[in-house]
Amino acid sequence: MQDIGEAVIKIIAMPSDTNPAGNIFGGWILSQIDLAGSVAAKEFAPERVVTISMKEVVFKQPVFIGDLVVCHAKIIKVGTTSITVIVNVTAERYCKESHARICQHVTSAEVTYVAVDSLGNKIVIDPDLIRYRGF
């Protein structure tokens, strides 16, 4: 079971997600990172959150069609109006030669979200909620 402020998204990379070289498109992976991070932030605070930044993302390994892409998101910091999440991305694939599953770290990202009202204005995250949830 995950803690509040954590999220795991698993998805199979499909042919429609490829770039011209046949690997999975980096933009698709960035989208999955943002989805996982926003789920973690939303589980922590009920306010609407929007992405304001994503720090450097370096792709260390390619992702291939059929890989199981796992995005594990965990809140690392909560401010007055913002929530910062670290998202680690791995790709799991079956190796025919060794008959084993291989898990490779693809990338990590630090994503910051800001709580906003219905008009898109920054709002304060409930301080009692922050204290109650241990930040």
Predicted regions mapped to residue ranges:
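Small beta-barrel nucleic-acid-binding modules, principally OB-folds
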Residues: 46-62
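Hot-dog-fold acyl-thioester-processing enzymes
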Residues: 1-50, 114-135
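HotDog/MaoC-like acyl-thioester-processing domains
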Residues: 3, 7-9, 64-65, 76-135
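Generic hydrophobic-segment detector
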Residues: 12, 16-17, 56, 63, ...
